Structure formats: structure tokens, C-alpha cells
Swiss-Prot record:
The lineage of its organism: Eukaryota, Metazoa, Ecdysozoa, Arthropoda, Hexapoda. Keywords: Disulfide bond, Glycoprotein, Immunity, Innate immunity, Secreted, Signal. Residues 47-169 form the N-acetylmuramoyl-L-alanine amidase domain. This is Peptidoglycan-recognition protein SD. Transmembrane segments: none annotated. InterPro entries: Amidase/PGRP_sf (IPR036505), Amidase_domain (IPR002502), Peptidoglycan_recognition (IPR017331), PGRP (IPR015510), PGRP_domain_met/bac (IPR006619). Changing K138R: In strain: Sim2, Sim3, Sim6, Sim7 and Sim8.
Length: 186
């Protein structure tokens, strides 16, 4: 490799350092929305942490299957136009793209407006997500501020604070209360 090739490789590494890789809708084979989705103006004032309350996943194939299953359930049984969350975090430490942050979510009833929905795939009532998943979520929150999806002083909330639910599970809820931007109030 020439010095120019090394320079290009080095600059590319610098450009992507600190960016959370996101598994796109095309990569997990999402269906298109089946109806209109209201838009929201970004940056948003809140990030809401949830869990899907179902099975967990630890590899790319299983996590993508969980994404398709959740989307199918939310579109057919819950009658959402698309998957309800903006981002989901797998046990493989990867972030999965849900709906656009500029589209109103479908996870917190009247509190969807102004909220970025981030759900961990699995049930975290008794056990917290693994370190890889937790680190991915923290990096995603930082990246969302840098990309003007969240305001710099956003409020971090648990799903149970904005909706009548046990989500994000007791173990995960206890952890996120220690994260930057945690807020007791909406």
C-alpha cells in the first residue's frame, strides 16, 4: 500500500471513529410503513428508554428476526403504521434503525410527540442488558445530540414514566437512573 493509500485509510478511520454503526431497515429487511406517520420537529427534548419485553438476541441473524417479528406484531396486532420505536438495541451490541427520529413514535401514547424511543430487545425486569448493548445505547444518545436528533440538555426517561407499563424492566430502569441527563420528571 502506498503512503496515499495509508493516508486515505487513516482519514476514513478518523471520520467514523465515535460513530455508532446502525443496522439499517434494508439490512434487517423491514417492511415499508403501511400508512402515514406524523412528523416531529427535531431536535427532540426527550429520550425514552424501553424494552421489548420479549426474547433477547445475541447475534445478527436472531436480532434481525426479532426486528421483523416486532414490526409484524406492532403493525398487525397493535395497528401501528410501522415499528413503534426509533432505535432498538440488540444483545449483539448493535443499534437497529426503526422509524426516523423526525417521525412521531408509537410507544408512549400522547407522550410520543417530542420523544426519541430507544428500546432494548429483550426483557430486563430481572437482569440488565449486557455491557455491549448498554455501551451502544450510551453512544447512540451522544450521537443523537451531535446529529441534532436530541437537544443537548435532553431529558432521559424510562418508558414507565411516560406510559402505563413496566418497561424498561426493573433492572434496566435502575441502571438508566445513573446515566447522564436522567430526569425524574418529564
Amino acid at each position: 500500500m502506498t503512503w496515499i493509500g495509508l493516508l486515505i485509510v487513516g482519514l476514513t478511520a478518523i471520520a467514523v471513529q465515535g460513530e455508532v454503526p446502525i443496522v439499517t431497515r434494508a439490512e434487517w429487511n423491514a417492511k415499508p410503513p403501511n400508512g402515514a406517520i406524523d412528523s416531529m420537529e427535531t431536535p427532540l427534548p426527550r429520550a425514552v428508554i424501553a424494552h421489548t419485553a420479549g426474547g433477547a438476541c445475541a447475534d445478527d441473524v436472531t436480532c434481525s428476526q426479532h426486528m421483523r417479528n416486532l414490526q409484524n406484531f406492532q403493525m398487525s396486532k397493535q395497528k401501528f403504521s410501522d415499528i413503534g420505536y426509533h432505535y432498538l438495541i440488540g444483545g449483539n451490541g448493535k443499534v437497529y434503525e426503526g422509524r426516523s427520529p423526525s417521525q412521531r413514535g408509537a410507544f408512549a401514547g400522547p407522550n410520543n410527540d417530542g420523544s426519541l424511543g430507544i428500546a432494548f430487545i429483550g426483557n430486563f425486569e430481572k437482569q440488565a442488558p449486557n455491557k455491549e448493548a448498554l455501551d451502544a445505547a450510551k453512544e447512540l444518545l451522544e450521537q443523537a445530540v451531535k446529529q441534532a436528533q436530541l437537544v443537548e440538555g435532553y431529558k432521559l426517561l424510562g418508558h414507565r414514566q411516560v406510559s402505563a407499563t413496566m418497561s424498561p424492566g426493573e433492572a434496566l430502569y435502575a441502571l438508566i437512573q445513573q446515566w447522564p441527563n436522567w430526569s425524574e420528571e418529564m
